[in-house]
Amino acid sequence: MRRIVVVGGSLAGHGAARVLRAQGYDGELVVVGGERHRPYDRYPLSKAYLTRSVDRAGLAIDDPPADVVWRLGERAVRLDLAGRQVVLDDRTRIGFDGLVVASGARPRDIDLVEGVQGAFVMRTIEDAETFRSSLESGTRRVVVVGGGLIGAEVAAHAVHQGHHTTMVDPSDLPTARAVGRPVAEHLQRLHEAAGVHLRNRTRMRTLDVRAGSVTGVVLDDGSRLPADVVMMATGTTPNVEWLRGSGLHASGGLACTPTLHARGSDRVVGAGDVVRVPQPLLDGEAPRVEHWASTLAHAELAAANLLAGPERARPLTALPTFGTTIHGARVRAVGFPQAADRSRVVWGSVEAGQALVALARGRQVVAVVSLAAHDHLPSLVGQLSPGTSLDDVIGTDVPLTSGQPSPKRSGPAVAGR
């Protein structure tokens, strides 16, 4: 291959470019990125970056790939697959022999907050910095719309900074899709104890904007929450518009094979938030995965398989993994908690703040979650395979931390999400 183009200048794109060079690719390598910054790590933006535990330099990604043509501040707007060209927003055409699609995803409500003072999404360095500044300029009434991981992290940060904080979520239990019901119930208790006002089973109808500044949030029941600051954390949309009409399958994300080749082209691979890959634990369903560790795994495998070709390509085996700390509670999950409809505590006590939980869809275990028990999580991860049921999962005999209640060796399966 004389030229490989990587569309996406964030973690996945950077990782793919680095691996291509590390594996001996010596042709021309072009990286197209919509932001003007060199690639940086977005993971801490809603965490350590908000608390100033990490500065801009700490977001920089180490080990930059050598001899790369960086096209930063430019966006791909069209893919001519037959002609093997990527068309940029300035109408420049870049030919390729191999293509890495790593164009990521954007906040679902980015257009809603554009130009509105006091309304934010969390995606870029600038997003995090302006939101942080708004919290540091005095006591504020903060409304967080969306109770997923980012929403929960932001709400926890805001309330601990002394702000009147409300979190609005359409589900009956925020973060349940991310960590399963048992741990989500624990996090809800922590939110309430910290002073976060929870408006579950509630949707936002619109922002209340006056003279260009947000003044509140109008809910679906017609009530209004006054607000000086609003964070929209309602999920993301994959950046696939530039792939439409190319012949690739890109509805809801770029559809890839288990080797991360795009369905329909051996010259195209995908990595990161933008791709959908069939998962054996989910009977071949192909969800998008938006976690830091998965992005790195995708980037490494996609780059290697692009060079190897489809005949020698290896399938993706790495399971999604993520971790977070909310109100001091350390949580780590492996697998697909969002798919679960049953759960079982296999070790410890969620109420005591230390537990291992297995999550299943029907009988198939699809995820395992640790609450302050990360050292013991690998024993459960090794049991995540097709055919493993909740009844098959074996916990650990390691006792709880001194002073904790005695272990709860197992509990009944609980229906519901």
Where are the regions a protein language model picked out?
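Beta1-alpha1 glycine-rich phosphate/pyrophosphate-binding loop at the start
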Residues: 1-70, 157-178, 379
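Mid-to-C-terminal Rossmann-like scaffold of FAD/NAD(P)H-dependent oxidoreductases
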Residues: 2, 276-374
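Flexible, glycine-rich terminal cap/loop adjacent to redox cofactors
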Residues: 7-11, 15, 19-26, 34, ...
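A Rossmann-like FAD-binding core segment of flavoenzymes
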Residues: 26-28, 70-88, 94, 161-258, ...
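FAD-site-proximal beta/loop scaffold in flavoenzymes
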Residues: 117-139, 213-218, 223-301
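Rossmann-like NAD(P)H-binding beta-loop-alpha module
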Residues: 130-179
